Amino acid sequence: MYKILKMEGRAKRAHMETVHGNIETPVFMNVGTAAAIKGAVSTEDLQQIGTQVELSNTYHLHVRPGDEVVKKMGGLHKFMVWDKPILTDSGGFQVFSLAGLRKIKEEGVYFHSHVDGRKIFMGPEESMQIQSNLASTSRWLSTSAVECGRAPLCAELCRPHGEMAAAMQK
């Protein structure tokens, strides 16, 4: 359930209920790219500072340790020893951050792993399957093959990727 508690202009304060706990927005999400928060922060530390939700990265977890490994271990919550909400992204940011290691096609993105050089294909279905294996609380599909660009962006660069993302949502 998602309930807007207050609005002011375009800003919203909301309450979201998930199977792994509630989230009050706006919220700061700790980023555990590879299912761990950097800097020797323990689960107890995160609980103590009031962390409501953690964000992990679909692409990086697919590459290492592997989404099948996480699935065999019972999903991200057991793998991380974290009982609160976990959001996984689509892997789309890597289209930007690993620009030298990828090729965008209509059906998705072809990557060369930054770890071992193997070829990895990630389209909408693959992204959702990986996220299903990870068993996160909430899964994003919206950026599967969208190229993030640096400002200022030109319409000629952005339009084709926006159209591709819209087509993938159908």
Predicted regions and their residues:
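Non-catalytic, usually N-terminal nucleic-acid engagement modules in DNA/RNA processing proteins
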Residues: 1-169
